[in-house]
Design a protein with these regions (language model features):
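Hydrophobic alpha-helical segments that form the core
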Residues: 106-109, 148-167, 179, 183-186
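N-terminal intrinsically disordered/low-complexity leader segments
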Residues: 1-6
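Amphipathic C-terminal alpha-helical segment
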Residues: 94-98, 116-120, 158-176, 187-189
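Amphipathic alpha-helical packing segments from all-alpha helical-bundle domains
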Residues: 116-142, 152, 182, 186
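Helix-turn-helix
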Residues: 10, 14, 18-57
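Hydrophobic alpha-helical connector segments
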Residues: 71-101, 153-157
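Amphipathic alpha-helical segments used for helix-helix packing
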Residues: 58, 82-86, 97-120
Length: 189
């Protein structure tokens, strides 16, 4: 077992990066072990159920990061449409600063690829989208939007920023994210 205090974190970070860049099926445990600089025993110690358990951990970590970032914008004292617009504009800056690398829409590998592997992973992916929508939904409800309309708007917004990010990375252009940001006031206002 590794004496490194962050062996588990290194494994999760490496697996997340590889799953995002190569996909679930193309990423092997041996590569994760090698690239994370961790002994094989560490991976099986932290993830005794193997690759699927590791993928589930990566899914949950990704969700937590996005929820935290989204909440930072949505919980500010500005209207929800401005908050979501600012969140998307931050994605624009991130895309430009990273030269369109290291950013992958959640739906790209996780929801599409892993949700077909097992019911547990599918449910985890579903929960991620629901968690993201809930951040927006709660703010819309606080602002007095009808519950059903708020749920629909939150779903559309998550679909919009995921789709815009996918197009941004594919086209290597911030145009789709900028267009999405422009549409937010009409959707949420």
């Amino acid at each position: 077992l590794s004496n490194k205090p962050n062996a588990r974190e290194a494994i999760v970070d490496t697996a997340s990066r590889l799953f995002f860049t190569q996909g679930y099926h193309a990423t092997g445990l041996s590569q994760i072990i090698k690239d994370s600089d961790s002994p094989k025993g560490s991976l099986y110690y932290y993830f005794p159920h193997g690759k699927e358990e590791l993928a589930l951990t990566c899914i949950n970590k990704t969700s937590e990061i996005v929820v935290r970032q989204l909440k930072q914008y949505v919980e500010k004292d500005v209207a929800v449409e401005k908050a979501v617009q600012n969140f998307i504009l931050q994605m624009v800056r991130d895309a430009e600063e990273s030269d369109y690398t290291g950013m992958v829409p959640f739906s790209f590998w996780v929801a599409v690829e892993t949700s077909c592997i097992s019911e547990e992973l599918r449910k985890a992916c579903q929960a991620v989208f629901m968690d993201w929508q809930d951040v927006i939904l709660q703010r819309l409800l606080e602002e007095g939007t009808d519950a059903e309309l708020a749920a629909d708007k939150a779903s559309v917004v998550v679909s919009l920023f995921e789709g815009a990010l996918l197009q941004t990375l594919t086209c290597r252009s911030t145009g789709p994210l900028l267009a999405a940001a422009k549409m937010i006031p009409g959707l949420l206002g």
